[in-house]
Amino acid sequence: MGSITDDEVIRKRLLIDGDGAGDDRRINVLMKSFTKWCHSSFSPEEGMSQYQRMMMSLAQCEFSMGKTLLVYNMNLKEMENYEGIYTDIEKSIASAHEKIAECKKEIQRAKRIRKNRQEYDALARVIKQHPDRHETLKQLEALDKDLQQLSHIKENVEDKLELRKKQFHVLLTTIQELQQTLENDEKMESDDTQDSPMENGD
């Protein structure tokens, strides 16, 4: 009766251990059971029952080892995949920094254009105070053309800057979604590891 109780305890421990850290203990328990089976006097029925239990434990060890190896290989492939993703992210971030630097230069250029336009406006007001001079009118027309060109350049710079801001926002959103996906994958793997004892129990 005591032997049956010990076997039940061993079986429960094997079921609770599942994959991972309990494998070493499962093997140690199997070795102890084998030693006990070799040096104890059992009736044929008890000996056969003990033998079948040891074979079941051995099969569990082999199954756990195969499953662990499979998970290990899958993790290696996932790590290679993640490394590729991280490399792409790093390249995207570097590209984003370059675009930001370019946008800053465009902003400085737009500020200079604005300053020049203000100076041109001030000069135009002075010129308008002398409309009777033919040469002054010619200069005013030239200034108007320059103002139109500068205004067009400024609009183009502002449009390009707005586009860069939108592209950078999309990039940051993509990076955040990817990080969330990776965290979800890690959580799912953790949940699968916790649920594996229940699967072995079934």
Curated annotation (Swiss-Prot):
Keyword annotations: Coiled coil, Cytoplasm, mRNA processing, mRNA splicing, mRNA transport, Nucleus, RNA-binding, Transport
Keyword flag Cytoplasm: yes
Record region (Disordered): 181-202
Disulfide bond residue pairs: none
GO molecular function, one term: RNA binding
Subcellular location(s) per record: Cytoplasm; Nucleus; Nucleus speckle
Ranges in a coiled coil: 86-167
Transmembrane intervals: none
A biological-process GO annotation: mRNA export from nucleus
Main location per the UniProt record: cytoplasm
GO cellular component terms listed in the entry, alphabetical order: cytoplasm; nuclear speck; nucleus; THO complex part of transcription export complex
Keyword field contains Signal: no
Stated role: Component of the THO subcomplex of the TREX complex which is thought to couple mRNA transcription, processing and nuclear export, and which specifically associates with spliced mRNA and not with unspliced pre-mRNA. Required for efficient export of polyadenylated RNA. Plays a key structural role in the oligomerization of the THO-DDX39B complex.
Family designation: Belongs to the THOC7 family.
Complex formation: Component of the THO subcomplex, which is composed of thoc1, thoc2, thoc3, thoc5, thoc6 and thoc7. Component of the transcription/export (TREX) complex at least composed of alyref/thoc4, ddx39b, sarnp/cip29, chtop and the THO subcomplex.
Annotated protein name in UniProt: THO complex subunit 7 homolog
Gene: thoc7
